[in-house]
Design a protein with these regions (language model features):
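Glycine-centered tight beta-turn/hairpin loop motif at sheet-sheet or coil-to-beta transitions
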Residues: 39-43, 65, 84
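C-terminal helix-rich "cap/oligomerization" subdomain common to oxidoreductases
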Residues: 39, 105-140
């Protein structure tokens, strides 16, 4: 999810997180709140709860002229809400979900693409996860 957020909104300028073991069911944090400010001045908040009574998988992006809602883990419809109207957009399942990623890597190795292979995006995602989980702040 955090990698998708940075893909959609760009590089992070600063992020702050608060996590706690609210349920005490396991020895691990199960509730996390995060605030992110991106280098392009977009701001957002994240709320994750792994102990709720409801199993809900939804990302909501509220923009100045509409709202997007979609699942992170399923291929459910994307919902667009604009001007008090709701639209549903569906996507067909692809047979091999990893294939576009693998193709870009192969094409990069063959010199036909410039897919980033430095691992910096994975590192930035891991830094955000640790920032939220450790209830700290990170700045770039």
């Amino acid at each position: 999810m955090l990698d998708l957020i940075t893909f959609l909104f760009g590089e992070v300028r600063t992020a702050t997180g608060i996590s706690t073991n609210q349920s005490k069911a396991y020895k691990i944090n199960d509730v996390t709140s995060g605030i992110i400010k991106f280098k392009n001045n977009i701001q957002g908040s994240i709320q994750l709860s792994f102990n709720g009574s409801e199993n809900r998988d939804e990302m909501v992006i509220v923009c100045s002229n509409g709202t997007l809602k979609f699942s992170l883990m399923t291929n459910d419809n994307l919902t667009v809400i604009k001007d008090d109207k709701t639209y549903e957009i569906s996507f067909e399942d692809i047979e091999h979900v990893q294939m576009p990623y693998i193709k870009r890597i192969v094409d990069t190795l063959l010199g036909k693409d410039d897919f980033d292979t430095t691992g910096i995006y994975g590192l930035r995602t891991q830094e955000l996860i640790e920032t939220f989980d450790n209830s700290t702040t990170i700045e770039y």
